[in-house]
Amino acid sequence: MGKKTVGVKKRLAKAYKQNRRAPVWITVKTKRSVFGSPKRRHWRRSKLKV
């Protein structure tokens, strides 16, 4: 187990921020045609290539 480099840490932070659900106002605005975010990622099912 080594230290994370700054580049890897920034990429992990970006992936962490992207891994959110779609905002509720989008669901309301599109009359529930948009439910989730296509970029959602589960920590166990699909791994990042960092």
Swiss-Prot record:
Gene3D superfamilies in UniProt: Ribosomal protein L39e
Pfam families reported for this sequence: Ribosomal_L39
GO biological process, one term: translation
GO MF entry, a single one: structural constituent of ribosome
Keywords: Ribonucleoprotein, Ribosomal protein
GO cellular component entries: ribonucleoprotein complex; ribosome
PROSITE patterns for this protein: RIBOSOMAL_L39E
InterPro entries the UniProt entry points to: Ribosomal_eL39 (IPR000077), Ribosomal_eL39_CS (IPR020083), Ribosomal_eL39_dom_sf (IPR023626)
SUPFAM superfamilies in alphabetical order: Ribosomal protein L39e
Family of this protein: Belongs to the eukaryotic ribosomal protein eL39 family.
Protein name: Large ribosomal subunit protein eL39
Organism expressing this protein natively: Archaeoglobus fulgidus (strain ATCC 49558 / DSM 4304 / JCM 9628 / NBRC 100126 / VC-16)
